[in-house]
């Protein structure tokens, strides 16, 4: 059994990546299981977990951080707003290059499974 999406790694909604993580999970799972025999399934499922765990953990942690930042109050909220107002959008978005630049090909290289 392989769990994907929120069943495997439920995330808070503050990064808006829940559906994306499910689609990435499905794509990686399909790739690692492609063409494998029954005797290879346990090893391929372990590879799926090795591939996905670091990224999904990072997404969940980033979502938690965003949630905290979105719910600041008082002086912290004012400071956050001042920093965000002064930050050009292209510079702000650089912090998410790791998120939006993900490529399945790069992820599969870590598994060392021919796809």
Label the predicted regions:
Residues 54-57, 82, 114:
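Small/flexible residues
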Residues 1-71:
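Conserved mid-domain beta->alpha element of the FAD-binding
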Residues 84-115:
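C-terminal auxiliary extensions adjacent to catalytic cores
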Residues 66-74, 104-108:
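Short alpha-helical linear motifs
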Residues 70-89:
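C-terminal domain-closing interface element
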């Amino acid at each position: 059994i392989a769990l994907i999406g929120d069943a495997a790694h439920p995330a808070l909604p503050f990064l808006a990546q829940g559906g994306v993580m499910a689609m990435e999970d499905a794509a990686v799972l399909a790739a690692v299981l492609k063409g494998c025999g029954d005797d290879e399934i346990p090893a391929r499922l372990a590879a799926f977990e090795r591939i996905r765990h670091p990224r999904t953990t990072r997404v969940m942690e980033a979502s938690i951080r965003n949630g905290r930042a979105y719910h600041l109050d008082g002086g912290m909220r004012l400071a956050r707003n001042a920093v965000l107002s002064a930050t050009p959008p292209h510079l702000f978005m650089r912090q998410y290059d790791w998120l939006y630049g993900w490529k399945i090909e790069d992820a599969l290289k870590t598994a060392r499974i021919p796809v």
